[in-house]
A protein has these predicted regions:
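N-terminal glycine-/serine-/threonine-rich phosphate-binding loop
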Residues: 2-41, 240
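Active-site beta-strand/loop signature of hydrolases that rely on acidic residues for catalysis
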Residues: 23, 34-57, 84, 140-149, ...
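Active-site beta-loop-alpha substructure in enzyme catalytic cores
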Residues: 29-44, 114-167
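Glycine/threonine-rich flexible loop motifs
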Residues: 53-59, 149-158, 181-183, 346, ...
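Short secondary-structure boundary/capping segments
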Residues: 56-61, 98, 158-161, 187-191, ...
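Catalytic-core segment of enzymes that process non-peptidic bonds
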Residues: 62-132, 160-213, 346
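ATP/NTP-dependent adenylation/nucleotidyl-transfer catalytic domains that generate, transfer
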Residues: 168, 222-259, 264-564
Length: 564
C-alpha cells in the first residue's frame, strides 16, 4: 500500500449547536485559507454544519432549509480542491451521522458508503470513520476520523485506540465547545492530529481551543503540542466548559454563594479565570452556625480575586420564617394539625433560604446566574438540599469527588495568579455544611461522610462496571480484602468502624440513600458537567427501593453471629 501524499488542512471548529450560518461562515473562511495555501483537501469534524444535539429542530422545516442553503455554499466553495465535512441526516424521524465529500463541486461520497475516492490524488480510497464507527482494517491509503469526542478524565481519546488498529495514514479531526444533553453537558476536547503510516499519532491542535493546521502528508509533520499535566488539563476542562456554556446561553455574569468551604472555593477559582471581576458576584450568607474561620476564608478569597462581594446574614430571615411556621395551625373541620420542626427541617430551611430566596433575588438584580457548588460525593447519596444548594444554572464540579476537589485546589494554590486567593485554612478546616451545632468546625465536627473512605466506596457503587453492591462489599469485608479492592490504606476500615455492626450499618445506610430519594434530587438538580463515562445524567436511573437479597442476608447474619 503506497503512502498517501497530499497537502491537507484539518480544521478543529468551535461548533455552535443549531447556529448553521455561524458554523458555515467559519468553514467557508477556512476553505478560502486552504485554497490560498494550495491545499488538496480540507477536512472538518463530525456535525460541523449543524452541531450535534439539535432535537428541537427535527420537525422544523426552516432549520433544514437553512442547512441546505449553506450546504450549497460549501459545495460551491469546493472548486479546485476537495472538502469533507460531517453532517446530520434524518431517517425515520431520528438523526444519524453522515458526511459529505465534494471535489470540484461534484459529490464523491454516497450516504451508504464510508469510502471516498479523490480523483487525481489517490490510487485507492479514503475510509471515513464517523462517531461510534469501529476502526476496521481496509486497503485504504488514508483513514479519517470525523469526531466529536468529549474530554473524560477516566478514559483515553479515541485516536489512541484507532492508532493501534489502523495501518494507513490516519487523520483525527475533532471539535471543541460543548454538547448540551439537558441534564448534563460535555466538553469537546479537540486534540486533532495526524499519523503517517508506521509513525505515532501527533496531536497538531490543542485541547479545547479552535484552530486549523496545514501540512503535507508523508513529510515531517509540524511540531506536536506540548503535553499538559493531568491536573492542569482537568482545570482547563472546567474553565473552558464554563466559558463555552455561558457563551452557549448568551450569559456573562455569575453569582456564587461563597461559604468558605472547599467546594465554593474551587467554583470561585474557576469562574475568576473565566469572567472579568466586574461580572462575578460572591455572597457570604452566615447564620449563627458559621464559624469565624470560614467567614474569614470567604472574605480573604473575595479580596484577592477583587470581584464584587457582600455579606448577607440569614439569621433574622430564618427566625422570622420559623416564628411564622410555629404560629400556624392547620385545620380540617374540628381537627387541628401542628407540624413538628426537626433539626433536619431547620438545616434544609437555611440552605433553601440561601439559594432559593437570597441568591435567586440577587441574580435578578445582578443580571446573572447562580453557580451550583455540589460535588459527586454528596450528589450520589443526596447529601444536599433540594431547591437549595443543588440548584443553579450549571454544576461545574459535579463530576468531581471530594478528594479530587482537594487535590485540584492544592494544585491551583501553586499557580501564581491564584496562590494568594486560596487560604491555607481551606485545607485544615473540616468540610462542613455548618447548619447546626453538630457541624461546628472549631470542635473538629463536620460532614457525616468520611471522604477518604466513602469516595472510594461510592465510586465503586456507580462508576465501576459491574457495580459494587452491598453483597460484593460485604464479601470483600469478610475476606479481609476490601481495602485492597478499593485501593485504601491498610487499617482504614478498622479505624472508622469498631465492629462489623458499625460497618454494615454504614454500608446499608449509604446504599439506601444512593438508590432512594437522592435519585429524585439528582433528577431535579442543576445540569452537571460530565468528566467521566459514568457521570450522573449519562447513567439512566430511577428510584428503586433496595430489597436485600437472600445471599446478602445470609452473609450478613453469618458475620454478625460471630459477635463484635
Amino acid at each position: 500500500m503506497a503512502t498517501c501524499k497530499m497537502k491537507i488542512k484539518i480544521a478543529q471548529l468551535y461548533i455552535k449547536t443549531g447556529q448553521i450560518k455561524s458554523n458555515a461562515e467559519k468553514m467557508l473562511h477556512i476553505i478560502s485559507e486552504a485554497k490560498n495555501k494550495n491545499c488538496d483537501l480540507v477536512v472538518f469534524p463530525a456535525t460541523a454544519l449543524t452541531g450535534f444535539k439539535v432535537e428541537k429542530q427535527l420537525f422544523r422545516e426552516e432549520f433544514w432549509e437553512e442547512a441546505e442553503f449553506w450546504r450549497n455554499k460549501l459545495i460551491d466553495a469546493s472548486d479546485d480542491l476537495t472538502v469533507i465535512w460531517g453532517d446530520l441526516l434524518v431517517e425515520k424521524h431520528c438523526f444519524c451521522d453522515t458526511f459529505f465529500a465534494y471535489q470540484n463541486k461534484k459529490l464523491i461520497s454516497t450516504p451508504k458508503s464510508n469510502q471516498v475516492s479523490i480523483l487525481g490524488l489517490l490510487d485507492s480510497t479514503i475510509e471515513i470513520l464517523l462517531p461510534n464507527d469501529e476502526p476496521i482494517s481496509s486497503n485504504s491509503n488514508l483513514t479519517l476520523r470525523l469526531a466529536r469526542d468529549s474530554y473524560q478524565k477516566d478514559t483515553s481519546p479515541a485516536y489512541i485506540e484507532d492508532g493501534e488498529k489502523i495501518v494507513s495514514d490516519y487523520g483525527y479531526i475533532n471539535s471543541v465547545g460543548i454538547n448540551d444533553h439537558g441534564s448534563f453537558i460535555e466538553i469537546l476536547q479537540g486534540q486533532s492530529g495526524w499519523k503517517n503510516r508506521n509513525d505515532k499519532f501527533t496531536p497538531l491542535l490543542p485541547y479545547f481551543k479552535e484552530g486549523s493546521v496545514s501540512f503535507t502528508t508523508s513529510l515531517k509533520l509540524p511540531e506536536p503540542n506540548e503535553s499538559i499535566p493531568k491536573m492542569e488539563l482537568l482545570f482547563q476542562s472546567l474553565c473552558y466548559s464554563g466559558k463555552y456554556f455561558l457563551d452557549h446561553l448568551g450569559l456573562s455574569k455569575v453569582l456564587i454563594g461563597l461559604s468558605g468551604g472547599i467546594d465554593s472555593a474551587l467554583s470561585t477559582c474557576i469562574y475568576s479565570q473565566i469572567l472579568s471581576s466586574k461580572n462575578l458576584l460572591l455572597v457570604n450568607m452566615p447564620s449563627r452556625f458559621n464559624s469565624d474561620v470560614t467567614k474569614s476564608i470567604a472574605a480573604k478569597m473575595a479580596k484577592e480575586i477583587n470581584c464584587w462581594y457582600g455579606v448577607m446574614p440569614i439569621e433574622e430571615i430564618i427566625h422570622s420564617t420559623l416564628m411564622g411556621y410555629k404560629s400556624t395551625t392547620f385545620t380540617r373541620n374540628d381537627e387541628e394539625l401542628t407540624l413538628p420542626l426537626s433539626t433536619l427541617t431547620i438545616e434544609n430551611l437555611q440552605a433553601r433560604t440561601r439559594t432559593s430566596q437570597i441568591l435567586s433575588t440577587l441574580s435578578s438584580g445582578f443580571g446573572g446566574v447562580i453557580a451550583c457548588n455540589s460535588n459527586k460525593s454528596e450528589t450520589i447519596v443526596g447529601y444536599g438540599t433540594l431547591y437549595g444548594d443543588s440548584a443553579g444554572f450549571l454544576t461545574l464540579i459535579g463530576d468531581l469527588w471530594k478528594i479530587e476537589i482537594y487535590e485540584l485546589l492544592a494544585y491551583l494554590k501553586e499557580k501564581p495568579e491564584l496562590k494568594n486567593a486560596i487560604p491555607n485554612e481551606l485545607f485544615t478546616t473540616p468540610p462542613s455544611a455548618e447548619l447546626s451545632e453538630n457541624h461546628d468546625v472549631t470542635k473538629g465536627l463536620g460532614d457525616p461522610i468520611h471522604y477518604s473512605y466513602h469516595d472510594k466506596l461510592f465510586q465503586s457503587f456507580c462508576e465501576w462496571v459491574p457495580n459494587v453492591t452491598p453483597l460484593v462489599a460485604l464479601r470483600w469485608y469478610q475476606e479481609g480484602i476490601l481495602e485492597e479492592k478499593l485501593n485504601l490504606p491498610k487499617g482504614k476500615v478498622a479505624e472508622l468502624f469498631k465492629s462489623p455492626t458499625e460497618f454494615i450499618q454504614d454500608l446499608e445506610y449509604w446504599w439506601r440513600q444512593y438508590n432512594g430519594l437522592s435519585c429524585a434530587k439528582r433528577v431535579q438538580s442543576a445540569p452537571s458537567l460530565s468528566l467521566s463515562s459514568r457521570s450522573f445524567g449519562k447513567i439512566e436511573e430511577n428510584q428503586i427501593p433496595w430489597i436485600p437479597t437472600q445471599a446478602y442476608e445470609k452473609l450478613k447474619n453469618e458475620i454478625l453471629s460471630r459477635g463484635e
